[in-house]
Design a protein with these regions (language model features):
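Extracytoplasmic/periplasmic ligand-capture domains
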Residues: 1-169
């Protein structure tokens, strides 16, 4: 390399290699929590359950993507297991404000990819949506009290991203 100048040989400049801990480019649906329907964690969980990443990866991404379980995937900040040490110390005073599962089971996205898995995920999603005040009427999800259809808008920075939202049609 070009790092063979006198200061290197005299050890006044140290060469050190750093591992790449780049999480790369993440693509995700970010829900606007200022919208009342997305303030309910059951609705957010149901939308995640209804998203069959494995099928989308196979049919649109040619199997090239890997689904990640942490916003900070590939870095030392990534969620990987149950909280411990300083992370647990930080979370402990918030225990009554975060889901109990944060302390009992590592976060994992739901798995689809097979008819049985997708069906089970959709059943659970519908159950959660029912608890949150929605029901199926015919083939449309509506608010139980008002009959208002469950609708939301997906915004993307590029028209080619529209196909990622097709599972929600």
């Amino acid at each position: 390399t070009s790092y063979d100048f006198p200061a290197v040989t005299e050890k006044r400049v140290l060469r050190e290699e750093f591992p790449i801990r780049n999480s790369g480019i993440m693509q995700a649906f970010c829900l606007n929590l200022r919208r009342p329907r997305f303030q309910d964690a059951r609705v957010r969980r149901a939308l995640n359950l209804a998203f069959d990443f494995e099928e989308l990866n196979k049919t649109i991404f040619y199997g090239l993507y890997e689904r990640i379980d942490s916003f900070f995937y590939g870095t030392e900040l990534a969620s990987s297991d149950l909280p411990q040490g300083r992370e647990l110390q930080f979370l402990e005073p918030l225990r009554d404000k975060v889901p109990a599962s944060v302390f009992t089971e590592p976060y994992r996205n739901p798995k689809g990819g097979s008819p049985d898995a997708v069906r089970a995920n959709l059943r659970e999603a519908l159950r959660l949506l029912g608890e949150a005040g929605y029901e199926l009427r015919g083939r449309q999800l509506v608010a139980k009290q008002t009959g208002e259809p469950f609708r939301f808008e997906l915004l993307g920075s590029d028209p080619t991203l529209e196909r990622y939202g097709l599972p929600y049609r």
